[in-house]
Swiss-Prot record:
A Gene Ontology molecular function term of the record: magnesium ion binding
Entry cofactors: Mg(2+); thiamine diphosphate
Organism (species): Listeria welshimeri serovar 6b (strain ATCC 35897 / DSM 20650 / CCUG 15529 / CIP 8149 / NCTC 11857 / SLCC 5334 / V8)
Cofactor note: Binds 1 Mg(2+) ion per subunit. Binds 1 thiamine pyrophosphate per subunit.
Pathway connected to this protein: Metabolic intermediate biosynthesis; 1-deoxy-D-xylulose 5-phosphate biosynthesis; 1-deoxy-D-xylulose 5-phosphate from D-glyceraldehyde 3-phosphate and pyruvate: step 1/1
CDD domains reported in the protein's UniProt record: TPP_DXS, TPP_PYR_DXS_TK_like
Binding site for Mg(2+): D144, N173
Record keyword Ligase present: no
Subunit description: Homodimer.
Name used for this protein in its record: 1-deoxy-D-xylulose-5-phosphate synthase
Gene: dxs
Length: 634
């Protein structure tokens, strides 16, 4: 079938089971070919092909509402709703989003990106539906990994208590980005392997008779349907105790089974959970055999071999630099422990976990728990390192304020993926942490300019004993500088003068130091003597150096790959105001007060002037303005 000609899902209603299976094969082939060029979340999407087809066949989108938890598994949904012809722009600047996007299609009714949100959103939708006396189905699709998130439990509790009609699809592939952990994961494993996977008619009747009016007829139909007896499982006690009707587990790649059970779920009253067992990467062997989460999300790859097409990398990743230093420090200090909320692979903590299994804790998708657990460890003299992506740290804001910072507990926070992350877009950009951490008392915020300084900040952080210490580091690879001895302590709040300022100064931190240095070099060839300051301590500021530069009337340009509102430059402006300085020439470059869309990081940075050319232009504008002011005074 020509998938590029699909306009909406209505065509599927005319297809028989064989044609639906052929459609599934075509979609798999398309996904593999397409993502081999663009990269993307290929593993999750190959696992939900039949499920997504069955959902669109059974229900009527957009009247009926699909909510894709996390949203990375929505590619098949996008194809069936008329967006296959945009897949060559997938995750590119201005192109097709890798997650559901309301402005992209009327079929994307709720935007996702972080996990465990779908059930709460669905809860709100069914309440609104019933208040307005409307008639449509609400179907959240949530994975077994996302179901471990605390927010999902809160929603299950409320939905079960309300008893309103809703169909929850539990997409159980036994594999999130990293192996699932926790008691609920063990419950699901028992359900998958239970003897009651082979059900008797008596047990099926017990479930189906909860369905009003049509219960008797459906029981007879189920008896005649191939394999239906073994797929309606009574022993979903956990969900039933919460007030849900439980169906499953069923084979998530058997269209007949899925369609039959969706029809049963449609006729039931009250909340229903349909437990669908799928295989992540289904239909593409390299992805099917993946046990580490490598094929969860990828860059371009060769279809024939399953090998990734990698850009030339001459340096280890920032995550590796941090985790290797953590290993070195933990070898010498048994009080150091590592905590991650379901990101051991991305944060490069697998070696630590192997070397120190009793001091490594993957708590699952539980950022709030991870943060307060770190606080608890700190009260007992341990030295916890919380490795967490910037975008996920915002989920633990109250715990940072109430449990960590308020008590001045010694928790080292490794803020991974700080700054722009590119293709994953709005929901994953690490651009808010400076703004929301800046306002919390007792918090130290840092960011290294290179690998050596990263190691030095790690040493400094674990030596610091007066409260929490955050180290930000970006996605991607370091600069490749030689890793010299790293036991040097950096005085708290001390910046580094890399180039002495004369005409103007660029004050920045992290990766943008390199942009500043290149801009300063170019400006020097044009006769401008511009200094570069490494503001490795974002909080506290180096007040001594700031006083000095301001008194010398040196124009200041702050540059940051983060939000201007509440950001580093805003802190410098606040310092100027607090100290009653007037007539200070200061400008800021950074990100505006908006959500930043997907695309390559260099393209996004360039569009906001966070580039060598952007810095050069702003410095020239500042100096020209200073000359005009000077001339006026004369």
């Amino acid at each position: 079938m020509d998938l590029l000609k699909i306009k909406d899902p209505s065509f599927m209603k005319q297809l028989d089971i064989k044609e639906l299976e052929a459609l599934a094969a075509d979609i798999r082939a398309f996904l593999i070919t397409s993502t081999s060029k663009s990269g993307g979340h290929i593993g999750p999407n190959l696992g939900v092909v039949e499920l997504t087809i069955a959902l669109h066949y059974t229900f009527n989108s957009p009247k009926d509402k699909f909510i894709w938890d996390v949203g990375h598994q929505s590619y098949v949904h996008k194809i069936l709703t008329g967006r296959a012809n945009q897949f060559d722009t997938l995750r590119k600047h201005g192109g097709l989003d890798g997650f559901p996007k309301r402005k992209e299609s009327i079929h994307d009714v709720f935007e996702t990106g972080h996990s465990s949100t779908s059930l709460s959103a669905a809860c709100g939708m069914v309440i609104a539906r019933d208040i307005k006396k409307e008639d449509f189905y609400v179907i959240p699709i949530i994975g077994d990994g996302a179901l471990t998130g605390g927010m999902a439990f809160e929603a299950l509790n409320h939905i079960g208590d309300m008893g309103k009609d809703m169909i929850v699809i539990l997409n159980d592939n036994d594999m999130s980005i990293a192996p699932n952990v926790g008691a609920l994961h063990n419950v699901l494993g028992k359900l998958r392997t239970s003897d009651k996977f082979q059900q008797t008619k008596t047990n099926i009747d017990k479930l189906i008779r909860k369905i009003p009016t049509a219960g008797e007829k459906l029981a007879d139909t189920a008896e005649k349907t191939k394999d239906s007896l073994k797929h309606l499982l009574v022993n979903g006690t956990f969900f039933e105790e919460l007030g849900f009707m439980y169906l499953g587990p069923i084979d998530g790649h058997n269209l007949e089974d899925i369609l039959t059970n969706l029809e049963i779920a449609k006729r039931a009253r009250g909340p229903v959970i349909l437990h669908v067992v799928t295989k992540k990467g289904k239909g593409y062997q390299p992805a099917e055999l993946d046990s580490r989460g490598t094929w969860h999300g990828t860059g371009p790859y060769k279809v024939e071999t399953g090998s990734f097409i990698k850009s030339v990398k001459t340096a280890p990743s920032w995550s590796s630099v941090i985790s290797n230093e953590l290993m070195r420090l933990a070898t010498a200090d048994e009080r150091i422990v590592a905590i991650t909320p379901a990101m051991p692979v991305g944060s490069k903590l697998e070696k630590f976990a192997k070397a120190f299994p009793e001091r490594f804790f993957d708590v699952g998708i539980a950022e709030q728990h991870a943060t307060t657990m770190a606080a608890g460890l700190a009260t007992q003299g341990m030295k916890p390192f919380l490795a967490i992506y910037s975008t996920f740290l915002q989920r633990a804001y109250d715990q940072l304020v109430h449990d960590v910072c308020r008590q001045k507990l010694n928790v080292v926070i490794g803020i991974d993926r700080a700054g722009l992350v590119g293709a994953d877009g709005e929901t994953h950009q690490g651009i808010f942490d400076i703004s929301f951490l800046n306002s919390i008392p007792n918090m130290i915020i840092t960011m290294p300019k290179d690998e050596v300084e990263a190691r030095q900040l790690m040493v400094t952080a674990f030596d610091y004993d007066a409260g929490p210490f955050a180290i930000r580091y970006p996605r991607g690879n370091g600069l490749g500088v030689e890793l010299t001895e790293s036991n040097t302590l950096i005085p708290i709040g001390e910046w580094e003068t890399i180039i002495q300022p004369i005409d103007a100064v660029i004050v920045t931190f992290g990766p943008t130091i390199q942009l500043a240095l290149k801009a300063a070099d170019q400006l020097e060839t044009e006769g401008y003597r511009v200094g570069v300051i490494n503001a490795r301590f974002i909080k506290p500021l180096d007040e001594t150096l700031l006083h000095q530069m301001i008194k010398q009337k040196i124009p200041i340009l702050t540059v940051e790959e983060s939000l201007l509102k509440g950001g580093f430059g805003a802190s410098v402006l606040e310092f100027i105001e607090t100290n009653n300085y007037t007539d200070v020439a200061i400008h800021r470059i950074g990100l505006p007060d908006e959500f930043i869309s997907h695309g390559s990081v260099p393209v996004i940075l360039e569009s906001y002037g966070i580039s060598e050319a952007g810095i050069e232009l702003k410095i020239k504008e500042m100096l020209a303005q200073s000359e005009k002011l000077r001339a006026k005074r004369l």
